[in-house]
């Protein structure tokens, strides 16, 4: 695992603070960025390199972990990537704030309906949970005794699970837990969906070294969770390359569900009735390895990739499903600016809420409901799976699995050209953009293309080897089959 610094735009100084200076609205853009905001950024560990009064923003150098923590601060409204940078707009004091990804999956009403994952046991297998009880968004979770168990499989004799730190990534599990269960009552900020589930935490990975022994820790953690009756497990861990000993590295063709850890994950699902939600991994932009990592390749586990926020296109880093798998991987995807580690817990939190509604759902039923709620379903691909899940659709299916939603339109294209006029009621702004997934089979993507949201007439010329094209107009989908 690596965590390198990157230039980051943090849009700042709340407009409310500027208005308190008595400035007319037209002069707000000329007001200086509020000093208290800049001081807050510095205290959070960000190194400010530039300040823009027009953008009401500061440019900083921050690691991905620091940027993720900044995103969760009360003064940050949202975080979105902009040409390789991050942008975090200031957070105004609105009622019941949620993070952008929760807005993307349409989960705003879950809190209104009292869906918090209450009574559901959730296991989290990760690197470490350093200082988790001290995080503002997790204090209530610990104070109300929702963290029911902890076990360190890396260093069992360490003791003091939340104050002992062995590596620079020992707070990774803490951040994942925040994405699962975080809620800051002071700012009415909901970070995760399953704020009242019961959690069992397992540390199986050492952040400063990588070896196959960690896969054994993972399997032992699964067995421990199974013995406690845990039926929903989240893990943002994955293994492919980067082992300390090069001979331990996997080869791409081994991402076929045959690894030790993948076989255990598949057994957990098929024989033990556990629903495993696993991040796809962040190797999608690597030259020699673009695939998801094991155990995300296991049949039956719910693998989650990453999209951007505005168009729902695959993030460059998000791991791709190998073409030789007989099933679609990843299964779903949603927004994260900093890695698939923070998409899996979003879907796990959604799953916990569905189990609260219907505790009798099997692992297979729960997984299928989540996939059916994806905006591309049933036309999944190896970039973003069945797409971005829709929480309200999933809720309806959890209550009545016989519901049938309108299927995407399938059209046949003769020759090498295809044209289509977008219906006026197919909205795209705020609901995903216009995206083409150009494929060499029903599921395997050749390339993805993002078009202007103003596009009304689409003219396609068939690519070499292209057999299918998925056209996404927001949440409306058209599947083109080339003849």
Q: Where do the protein language model's features map onto the residues?
A:
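Structural recognition of the beta-strand scaffold that forms the well-ordered cores
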Residues: 59, 80, 121-126, 178, ...
């Amino acid at each position: 695992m690596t965590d390198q610094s990157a230039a980051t735009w943090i849009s700042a100084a709340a407009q409310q603070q500027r208005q308190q200076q008595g400035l007319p609205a037209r002069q707000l853009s000329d007001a200086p960025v509020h000093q208290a905001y800049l001081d807050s950024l510095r205290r959070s560990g960000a190194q400010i390199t530039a300040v823009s009064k027009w953008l009401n923003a500061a440019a900083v150098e921050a690691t991905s972990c620091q940027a993720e923590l900044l995103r969760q601060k009360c003064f940050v409204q949202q975080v979105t990537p902009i040409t390789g940078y991050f942008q975090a707009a200031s957070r105004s004091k609105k009622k019941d704030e949620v993070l952008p990804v929760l807005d993307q999956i349409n989960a705003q009403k879950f809190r209104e309906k009292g869906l918090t994952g209450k009574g559901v046991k959730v296991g989290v297998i990760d690197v470490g949970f350093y200082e988790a009880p001290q995080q503002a968004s997790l204090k209530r979770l610990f104070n109300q005794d929702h963290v029911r168990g902890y076990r360190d499989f890396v260093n069992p004799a360490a003791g003091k699970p939340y104050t002992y730190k062995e590596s620079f990534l020992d707070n990774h599990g803490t951040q994942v837990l925040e994405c699962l269960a975080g809620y800051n009552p002071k700012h009415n900020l909901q970070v995760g969906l399953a704020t009242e589930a019961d959690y069992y935490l397992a540390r199986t990975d050492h952040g400063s070294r990588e070896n196959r022994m960690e896969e054994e820790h993972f399997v032992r953690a699964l067995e421990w969770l199974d013995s406690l009756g845990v039926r929903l497990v989240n893990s943002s861990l994955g293994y492919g390359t980067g082992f300390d000993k090069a001979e331990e590295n996997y080869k791409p063709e081994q991402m076929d569900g045959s690894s030790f850890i993948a076989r255990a994950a598949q057994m957990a699902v098929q024989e033990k009735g556990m629903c495993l939600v696993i991040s796809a991994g962040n190797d999608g932009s690597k030259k020699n390895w673009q695939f998801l990592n094991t155990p995300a390749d296991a049949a039956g586990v719910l693998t989650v990739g990453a999209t951007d926020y505005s168009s729902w296109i695959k993030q460059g880093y998000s791991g791709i499903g190998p073409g030789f798998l007989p099933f679609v991987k990843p299964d779903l995807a949603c927004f994260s600016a900093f890695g698939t580690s923070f998409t899996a817990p979003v879907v796990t939190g959604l799953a916990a809420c569905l189990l609260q509604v219907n505790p009798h759902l099997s692992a297979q039923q729960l997984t299928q409901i989540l996939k059916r709620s994806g905006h591309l379903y049933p036309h999944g691909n190896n970039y973003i799976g069945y797409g971005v899940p829709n929480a309200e659709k999933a809720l309806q299916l959890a209550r009545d699995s016989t519901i049938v939603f309108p299927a995407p339109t399938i059209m046949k294209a003769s020759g090498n050209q295809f044209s289509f006029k977008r219906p006026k009621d197919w909205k795209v702004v705020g609901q995903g953009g216009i995206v083409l997934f150009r494929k060499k089979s029903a599921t395997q993507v050749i390339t993805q293309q993002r078009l202007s949201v103003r596009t009304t007439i689409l003219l396609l010329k068939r690519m070499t080897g292209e057999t299918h094209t998925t056209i996404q107009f927001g949440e409306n989908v058209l599947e083109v089959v080339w003849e």
